[in-house]
């Protein structure tokens, strides 16, 4: 087995864990490689470009928060991703640093369970598809005279057109990310749905809508001028022109996250969102 290791190099704890992991792997003669930035940060000569990691590795280890895991997922292409949480919240990174070694034992032995998560695929005319595990976001950008109108179609039928600061199209996995901050619902991660969530809409009647994930969503921005950022999992990919159409649908490719069998989704919600903070469970 060969592991690809991606590290949040801005966090000292992640760098410390990376060095400990290297020693652990070396002791067991397990092959590994870092991406270029991670290798440079810890002084390792074993690295490859991120785009090449999937071709040469059997599994990915993410040391950081959800953002680091999202980065790893873009390159994993359905190969298992083990997320160790050294971030702040961590909905996706299921293992704590204390749980890392047991999780690593299970990973290298093949004795692990996984969560298979759907992704979004966004395309522009005559361009290659882009994928996102959490969400596709289109923002108002440089349209300054008045809020732009976002025109949304489902399977080529108009759903609506409304003025807002932007729009989030999220998977069930991504429902606890930007969509939640914008007022969207929490959706159980294995639900076969997407949620379309407006960002600060001009009208109070504009609300998030949950749709089946077999729908094709088309979004364009009705504005006389401006450029509108298109982001995939928070990373800007394009600046859209007025009227340019983004087609969003379920990707044929999945992400496989190594599961923590000691934690249920209900427990994750309780702990991350402090749902039992005011009234502890059982009291």
UniProtKB/Swiss-Prot annotation:
Keywords from the named record: ATP-binding, Cytoplasm, Kinase, NAD, NADP, Nucleotide-binding, Transferase
GO molecular function list: ATP binding; metal ion binding; NAD binding; NAD+ kinase activity
Cofactor field: a divalent metal cation
Gene3D superfamilies cross-referenced by the UniProt entry: Probable inorganic polyphosphate/atp-NAD kinase, domain 1, Probable inorganic polyphosphate/atp-NAD kinase, domain 2
Residues annotated for NAD(+) binding in this entry: 66-67, 134-135, 145, 163, 165, 176-181
InterPro entries per UniProt: ATP-NAD_kinase_N, ATP-NAD_kinase_PpnK-typ_C, NAD/diacylglycerol_kinase_sf, NADK
Protein's cellular compartments: Cytoplasm
Recorded catalytic activity of this chain's protein: NAD(+) + ATP = ADP + NADP(+) + H(+)
EC number annotated for this UniProt entry: 2.7.1.23
Domain of life: Bacteria
Claim: Signal is one of the keywords in the record: no
Any single GO CC term annotated in Swiss-Prot or TrEMBL for this entry: cytoplasm
GO biological process: NAD metabolic process; NADP biosynthetic process
Active site: 66 (proton acceptor)
Name of the top EC class for this enzyme: transferase
Family listed: Belongs to the NAD kinase family.
PANTHER family linked to this entry: NAD KINASE
Role noted for this protein: Involved in the regulation of the intracellular balance of NAD and NADP, and is a key enzyme in the biosynthesis of NADP. Catalyzes specifically the phosphorylation on 2'-hydroxyl of the adenosine moiety of NAD to yield NADP.
Protein name according to UniProt: NAD kinase
């Amino acid at each position: 087995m060969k592991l690809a290791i991606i590290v949040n190099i801005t966090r000292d704890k992640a760098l410390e864990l990376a060095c400990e992991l290297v020693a652990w792997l070396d002791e067991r003669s397990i092959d590994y490689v870092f991406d270029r930035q991670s290798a440079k940060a810890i002084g390792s000569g074993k690295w490859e470009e991120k785009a090449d990691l999937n071709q040469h590795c059997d599994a990915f280890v993410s040391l950081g928060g959800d953002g680091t895991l999202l980065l790893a997922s873009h390159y994993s292409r359905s190969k298992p991703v083990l997320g160790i949480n050294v971030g702040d919240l961590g909905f996706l990174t299921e293992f704590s640093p204390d749980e890392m070694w047991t999780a690593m034992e299970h990973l290298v032995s093949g004795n692990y369970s996984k969560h298979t998560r759907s992704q979004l695929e966004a395309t522009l005319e005559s361009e290659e598809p882009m994928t996102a595990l959490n969400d596709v976001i289109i923002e108002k950008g440089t349209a300054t005279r008045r809020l732009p109108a976002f025109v949304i179609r489902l399977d080529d039928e108009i759903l609506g057109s409304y003025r807002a600061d932007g729009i989030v199209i999220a998977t069930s996995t991504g429902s606890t990310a930007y969509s939640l901050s914008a007022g969207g619902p929490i959706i159980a991660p294995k639900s076969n749905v997407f949620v379309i969530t407006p960002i600060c809409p001009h009208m109070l009647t504009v609300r998030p809508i949950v749709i089946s994930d077999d729908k094709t969503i088309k979004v364009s921005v009705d504005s006389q001028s401006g450029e509108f950022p298109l982001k995939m999992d928070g990373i800007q990919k394009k600046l859209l022109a007025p009227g340019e159409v983004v087609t969003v649908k379920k990707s044929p490719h999945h992400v496989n996250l190594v599961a923590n069998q000691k934690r249920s989704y209900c427990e994750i919600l309780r702990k991350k969102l402090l749902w039992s903070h005011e009234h502890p469970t059982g009291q």
